[in-house]
Amino acid sequence: MAAVQEILGTYSPEDLIITISNQFFSHSITGYADGTFVSVARQVPPSTLYTGSDNTNARVVRANKGSTIKVTLHQASESNDILSQALIMDESTRDGTWCFNILVKDGTGRSLYFSPQAFIANNPESTFGAEISTREWDIQCVSLSNFTGGNGKLTDDAYRTLQAMGVTVDPRWAPA
């Protein structure tokens, strides 16, 4: 039984996969910028606390899973062309035909994000100078299912807890 201090987690940015696809195309995004190149955020929290003036409390629960995935690419990335064209096609048809599904998967960990309906919100701000610049793409997701997980083997305690919560753990993450 390994203690949490004895577990070495591993993360590799080269193993993060972002794929967009619909009935017309499938594309694995490449050309990530240096530094933070993807962020995932829900637009409305799943629950918020309400406190009355007499210090009574309630919780507001929301089912809205609308989310934003921000992908930052360097300007030389060919994925800029794909995302630009997807936006152009979506703007020209204006009927959702060019919406796509999106998958973000950490290949060295357990994090996984998926939306069956997403679209490019806007063109990124473009700057040009003596250095390579970046392009930040906002991808709006209608309903995002997400699992934010770790990147190392699980301890016995975490493994048992996840099983008690009804999670089937991939054997590669089971305690050694």
Regions found by a protein language model. Give the residues of each.
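Solvent-exposed edge beta-strands and adjacent loop segments
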Residues: A2-E78, A118-R135, A164, P175-A176
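Short, intrinsically disordered/low-complexity patches at protein termini
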Residues: T93-D95, E136-I139
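Short, acidic/charged, Gly/Pro-enriched secondary-structure junctions
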Residues: Q85-Y113
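Intrinsically disordered, low-complexity terminal/linker regions enriched in Pro/Ser/Gly
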Residues: A2, G149-A176
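Hydrophobic lipid-interacting interfaces of membrane-associated proteins
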Residues: V142-G149
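Short, surface-exposed beta-strand/loop "edge" segments at domain boundaries and coil↔beta transitions
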Residues: F24-I29, S79-N80, K105-S115, F147
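Residue-level recognition of well-ordered beta-strand positions that form the cores
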Residues: K70-H74, L103, D138-V142
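"Short basic amphipathic alpha-helical interaction patches in structured regions
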Residues: L83-S92, S115-F119, K153-D156
